[in-house]
Design a protein with these regions (language model features):
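N-terminal helix-turn-helix DNA-binding core of bacterial DNA-binding proteins
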Residues: 11-53, 72-82
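A short, conserved structural fragment
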Residues: 62-72
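Basic amphipathic alpha-helical segments that dock to polyanions
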Residues: 54, 58-61
């Protein structure tokens, strides 16, 4: 059994599709890639994504060990920096292949 979000799946492809298919998730993962980003930077990069939606999707990605939230306290203020975990980095070549396939076979 494979757990994605709060649902259990028999098929690993279905479990991963459940996560990657959620609104903004692909753009969040692809947008971070090889850099660390603060919440505000992510929100500005995702034009049209509400603060609430971004928080929900980041929580989903953190819970599924795709993104890491590095929290540091600076002058009594907690600063969160988000970046891809090892497993998140391993998704990038897969997502690149999905982009190439989509560009070749899906009508836009």
């Amino acid at each position: 059994m494979y757990k994605a979000d709060i649902t259990m799946y028999d098929c690993p492809v279905e479990a991963l599709s459940n996560i990657l298919g959620k609104k903004w998730v692909g753009q969040i993962i692809w947008g971070i890639q090889d850099k660390k980003m603060r919440f505000g930077e992510l929100q500005r990069a995702l034009d049209g994504c509400s603060k609430k939606m971004l928080m929900q999707q980041l929580d989903l990605l953190i819970d599924n060990n795709i993104i890491i939230n590095d929290k540091k306290t600076v002058n009594n203020i907690v600063e969160s920096t988000y970046y891809l975990s090892e497993s998140g980095l391993l998704l990038l070549p897969f997502m690149d292949k999905m982009i190439n396939w989509s560009n070749s076979y899906l009508l836009c």
